[in-house]
């Protein structure tokens, strides 16, 4: 396959896979309801926990993380078929897949382009790309979550820290400049998307009205 065709295939598989929204499927087929009509309106783990409980949240979390992992692994495998003389960073495939999986999750083609915020899908992608960064990101998340009870604040801070950690880690590994740029820009896009999807949460934090972990909302 040509490099252009491989890029298209990676983008398509990641977006379509990301569009398989676990939270929506679990809420519809196990609870005969749509999680997007409750709480924050998002189809993510936190809203599933508030609305349907721990089992629903756990199933959603596992499905969302796996989407990120599988999308990136497929992207990496497909980019392995690039011609030997292709002047393309091998990291382009994994970050393209990661970004499009998050896009698919937040704007799923199968569910009216309204999904979740992509945090766990991004976490799954990071697990497949840079597993060494996950403990650091998890620590950042907990440092924000524990004193405030705000999952959203932890997610936003973690998303902001991810490109910085990626840059530092890429430089420490001695990657070529081309790969450092691809990794850092890819991480910045992923982090920026997650922050953008939390813009309503940011406003609620400013207003002192953000949901706290453990609160349960069954209606808007």
State the predicted function of each range.
Residues 175, 182-220:
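C-terminal membrane-associated helical module and adjoining short loops/tails
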């Amino acid at each position: 396959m040509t490099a252009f065709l491989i890029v298209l295939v990676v983008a398509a598989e990641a977006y379509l896979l990301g569009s398989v929204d676990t939270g929506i499927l679990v809420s519809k087929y196990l609870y005969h309801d749509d999680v997007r009509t409750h709480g924050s309106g998002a189809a993510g783990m936190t809203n599933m926990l508030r609305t349907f409980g721990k089992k629903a949240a756990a199933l959603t979390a596992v499905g969302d993380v796996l989407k990120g992992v599988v999308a990136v692994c497929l992207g990496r495998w497909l980019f392995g078929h690039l011609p030997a003389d292709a002047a393309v960073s091998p990291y382009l495939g994994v970050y393209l897949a990661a970004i499009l999986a998050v896009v698919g999750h937040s704007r799923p083609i199968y569910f009216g382009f309204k999904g979740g915020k992509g945090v766990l899908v991004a976490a799954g992608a990071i697990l497949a790309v840079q597993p060494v960064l996950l403990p650091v990101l998890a620590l950042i998340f907990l440092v924000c979550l524990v004193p405030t009870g705000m999952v959203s604040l932890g997610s936003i801070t973690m998303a902001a820290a991810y490109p910085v950690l990626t840059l530092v880690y890429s430089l420490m590994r001695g990657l070529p400049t081309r790969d450092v740029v691809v990794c850092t820009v890819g991480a910045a896009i992923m982090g920026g998307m997650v922050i953008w999807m939390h813009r309503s949460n940011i406003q609620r934090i400013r207003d002192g009205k953000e949901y706290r972990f453990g609160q349960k909302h069954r209606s808007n």
